[in-house]
Amino acid sequence: MSGERAKRFPLALEDLKRAPRKSEGRPGERQAAGAVPKAADKPAAVLKPVAVKPAAVRAPLPGIAAAKPATAPKPTAPKPALPKPAAPSIAPAGAFALTSERVRERMVERLRANGVTDARVLDAMAAVPRHLFVDPGLATQAYEDSALPIGHQQTISKPSVVARMIELAMAGRTLERVLEIGTGCGYQAAVLSHVARDVYSIERIKPLYERAKLNLRPLRVPNIRLHYGDGRVGLPSAAPFDAIVIAAAGLDVPQALLEQLAIGGRLVAPVGAQSGQHQVLTLVERVAHAQWRESRLDRVFFVPLKSGVI
């Protein structure tokens, strides 16, 4: 040990009271060494824990469940986009029914403007959905005042003609039994069912007879009786009738039908050439057992009245 070091050690008591010497060395080492005594000279303030009061939890209102704490959504893999289903080509029944009802109301307003005055006839025309009796491709034309094809060279009569013939047959009366010659698609029989107690209808073309049954089935009309047969012969088993409506034109009214008309009854029929020229809507009233009165009214166009069945 050198003489200088020997003088420094052991230290006297007064030497221990002196301030410690600064450490010698490189500047960086002196700075780092000096930082430790400063931190040690003054102890760091100790933070007291702050008492956190729990948030007041409100009791849930009666009838309302307490809300669950929100949780972070779990990441999910994106699903491939599915193609949207194609829209149905047919409108929903409820929506189309409303649309049909509105256009029927407009049709009835036109009928009233054209001279149909019997409220029962107008109500019957408003009640029957004509679009159900035509081909789907013609449904948009169902409430126009025009005749439309129904197949087998037959047509459904114009609404104005149907209303006019029924109003003439009624003449303000309440009808009991009505006979229709030429059922066709069943539309006129459906309208008649609203103004008469019993409706009998005859069709000579078997496919149309079957079609009329299908058309009328959804309407659940209980007072229509369809028959497949020769309309010129009528239906003697159900006679006499308060009214007879013929939906085809003959050169004259068959005598068998005149005989099946009740006294005081009315028959309405188009009469004229089979070609459709010079056809006239004719009213025949039976005034006595062997007496009928005839009135010629409007120009019309109907398919020909034929005999036999096919």
UniProtKB/Swiss-Prot annotation:
Location of the region described as Disordered in the Swiss-Prot/TrEMBL record: 1-44, 67-88
GO MF assignments: protein-L-isoaspartate (D-aspartate) O-methyltransferase activity
Comp. bias intervals (Low complexity): 32-44
Subcellular location: Cytoplasm
Catalytic activity: [protein]-L-isoaspartate + S-adenosyl-L-methionine = [protein]-L-isoaspartate alpha-methyl ester + S-adenosyl-L-homocysteine
Main location: cytoplasm
GO cellular component term, pick one: cytoplasm
Active site per UniProt: 157
One GO term of the biological process aspect: methylation
Function comment: Catalyzes the methyl esterification of L-isoaspartyl residues in peptides and proteins that result from spontaneous decomposition of normal L-aspartyl and L-asparaginyl residues. It plays a role in the repair and/or degradation of damaged proteins.
Protein name: Protein-L-isoaspartate O-methyltransferase
Lineage of the species this protein comes from: Bacteria, Pseudomonadati, Pseudomonadota, Betaproteobacteria, Burkholderiales
Gene name tied to this protein: pcm
